[in-house]
Amino acid sequence: NFKSRINKTTALSDKNHRFVPFFGSSEWLRFDALHPAVLAEKYDRNYRPYFIGQRGAASLNQYLGMQQMLPELKNGTAVYVLSPQWFTKKGYNSAAFQQFYNNDQLSSFLSQNQTDANSQYAAQRILEMKPEITMKSQLSKVANGQDLNSLDKTYIQFMAELNKREDALFSPFAASNNANYDKKVLPYLKELPDKFSYEALDQVAVRDAEAHTKSNDFGIDDRFYKKRLAKKIGKLKGFQKNL
């Protein structure tokens, strides 16, 4: 579950399995032979990817989600994939941000008691995305570079404990996608060479791309192109020229 603290911290602190967080967006939902989960399984790597990302989740959501698991991330390994659609003139969509936001992320962020430039900018962006937000007074202080007083810190600590308990209560009810392993990982294992080599994987990638991009000259997957673009491709000419 993208918003759950306990799911993420439990996985990343597992002593019996080494999970490496892979931060991103909808990329992780698109499986093929070169998906990180498939590669890790095929070549029995000493870790397994722990995918943290959903369609529409962008950098601010990921930043806040990281606040929930800073001890687990410290001195560790992580992979972060940037999506081109994040970089727009108007910035992130407020509705999309709120879909992946919860109060535990905010109390985790404020509990760090940071007033540096990064925290200040993050606080400003959060207020832009959700103007009427819990702990707005404390968040506004961080956004303005002001120190939090003892009363602020006590309130934040209280809210942090409350949010942690709420997360622990509801997280077990989050839907599990473990059943997708047989459906989304195993079928692709046979497409990979038994012996790992970048040259061989390049050949797999080229062969797969050629087989699935025959309907257009843009290198776009045939199913996506036919369903989403084919009928309106003419209208898109010059669409992003002035961005």
What are these regions (language model features)?
Residues 1-17, 22, 40-44, 72:
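Membrane-anchoring hydrophobic segments
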Residues 2-7, 57-66, 239-241:
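N-terminal post-signal-peptidase region of extra-cytosolic proteins
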Residues 4-8, 31-38, 212-224:
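Short low-complexity stretches enriched in small and charged residues
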Residues 6, 12, 35, 64, ...:
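Residue-level detector of functional hotspots within protein domains
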Residues 17-33:
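Catalytic nucleophile-elbow at a beta strand-turn-alpha helix junction centered on a G-D-S/GDSL motif
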Residues 24-25, 80-85, 223-227:
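Short loop/turn segments at strand-loop or loop-helix junctions that form parts
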Residues 28-118:
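Membrane-embedded segments
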Residues 110-243:
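Secreted/periplasmic serine-hydrolase-like ester/acetyl group-modifying domain
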